[in-house]
Amino acid sequence: MKGVSKVYGTLHALSDINLTVNAGDWLSIMGPSGSGKTTMINLIGCMDSPSSGSVVLDGHDISRESAASLTRIRRDKIGLIFQQFHLISYLTAVENIMVAQYYHSMPDEGEALEALEKVGLGDRARHLPSQLSGGEQQRVCIARALINSPDILLGDEPTGNLDEENEGIVIDILRTLHREGATIIVVTHDPEVGDVAQRKIVLEYGKIVQDIDQTRPLEPKENGGRA
């Protein structure tokens, strides 16, 4: 993102944002409601275009791309996980994933089953959403997001509706994906989710007010504590 601003009428959702995320990074985006977090993830995910500035994704400046091109980039390069599960109630877990495969023109039940195995739900493949817990439904959504082998995995409050146990399971899945080389960008209100990322930015009133490298050790205080 280079000098990115996004304006809706009189609302300045983002103001002059400069942000670089490298391949393989894990970034968390935090901040109060209305600070611009979801707007930022929508721009990165090619679901919206900036009012000014440029968003460059794998060499593509999305502000200059056509709607058809943005759809293709989103289909080929991005996996999306939302707070709401958006599963089709009358389809099984594996069928919900295969619906996403049709979008990517690659229906393959074997690959859909493999994606469910990856998130620990191989034995739930034939279950309907109503037969799954909230945590299991979110894991189906993660499997669905992975089906096109995306370059970037984007999450907008992916643990927002989960209890502590299922939140931990989802975080562990994200850790595994990151170790395998995935680029992960997650919007969250939850400090525990935000703190597991390599890097954390905090937004306020559409501006980045903190940019924290969380891979660096904390400086020891003089009394022996940690800064």
Model region roles, listed by residue range:
Residues K2-Y205:
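ABC family nucleotide-binding domain
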Residues K207-A227:
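Conserved beta-strand-loop-alpha-helix hinge in the C-terminal portion
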